[in-house]
């Protein structure tokens, strides 16, 4: 159940977006109704014809309400039931078909996966990314599974049109590591160190530090000014 989200300019001095990640067709409509400012429709598991049909419908609805919309072509790999699936490389022509619908951002599989990358990961397919960029023009491309991708690959991906990079697992790992150190140091046993606000504070600060580091790497600092 998703409740109504009310936004206030007093929350933060920078521009904010409440974005749905990997939304289903039904989930997108729920989040639109709830007040999200941006949605992602992940139709990559549908045949391309159905992905196009559903994306086209959601583009019209989102833009009528002033929302941005991200779409996906080519499944992003990841771990499920202990098995790591390697990411697919999207068909550049299918990417163009989705981009031509007027989406604001396009997530395309280029060998990237969610979560930790296995030792035998072959890396990003820059050949695929280059082909997609040439066919989609100025379309902002999205790279999911940003955790663990080497810096040189990140920078090359940005040079080839990637404008949004998702990083989640690395933030979670930073949080877990900082929280673990707090407890192992016995700080939860000092005074009211067991208070969740104190117990979780180091983890929250660790996430902030990780995000700051990524913003600097991605060239995102100062873009909201």
Identify the role of each PLM range:
Residues 17-21, 69-70, 142-144:
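Structural detector of well-ordered beta-strand residues that form the stable sheet scaffold
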Residues 4, 20, 145, 167:
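Small/polar loops that bind or transfer phosphate-bearing groups
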Residues 3, 45, 119, 201, ...:
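Charge-dense, low-complexity intrinsically disordered segments
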Residues 16, 20-22, 177, 186:
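Glycine-rich nucleotide/cofactor/substrate-binding loop typically near the N-terminus or early
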Residues 150-225:
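C-terminal alpha-helical cap/extension of soluble enzyme domains
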Residues 110, 145-147, 169:
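Active-site proximal loops enriched in glycine and acidic residues that flank catalytic Cys/His/Asp
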Residues 1-11:
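Single conserved hydrophobic/aromatic residue that forms the stacking wall/gate
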Residues 9, 22-137, 151-162, 173, ...:
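Alpha/beta enzyme core
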């Amino acid at each position: 159940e998703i409740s109504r989200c009310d936004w206030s300019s007093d929350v933060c001095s920078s521009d904010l977006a409440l974005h749905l990640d990997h939304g289903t067709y039904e989930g997108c409509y729920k989040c639109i109704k709830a007040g999200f400012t941006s949605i992602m429709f992940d139709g990559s598991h549908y045949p391309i014809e159905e992905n196009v049909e559903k994306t086209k419908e959601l583009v019209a609805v989102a833009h009528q309400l002033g929302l941005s919309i991200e779409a996906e072509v080519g499944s992003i790999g990841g771990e499920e039931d202990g098995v790591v699936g390697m990411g697919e490389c999207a068909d550049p022509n299918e990417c163009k078909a989705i981009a031509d619908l007027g989406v604001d951002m396009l997530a395309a599989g280029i060998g990237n996966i969610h979560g930790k990358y296995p030792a035998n990961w072959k890396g990003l397919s820059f050949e695929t990314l280059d082909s997609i960029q040439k066919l989609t023009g100025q379309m902002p491309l999205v790279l999911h599974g940003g955790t663990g991708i080497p810096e040189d690959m990140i920078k090359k991906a940005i040079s080839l049109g990637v404008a949004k990079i998702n990083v989640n697992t690395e933030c979670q790992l930073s949080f877990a590591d900082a929280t673990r150190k707090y407890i192992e140091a016995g700080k939860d046993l000092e005074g009211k160190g067991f208070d969740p606000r104190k117990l979780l504070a180091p983890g929250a600060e660790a996430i902030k530090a990780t995000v700051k580091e990524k913003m600097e790497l991605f060239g995102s600092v100062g873009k909201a000014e």
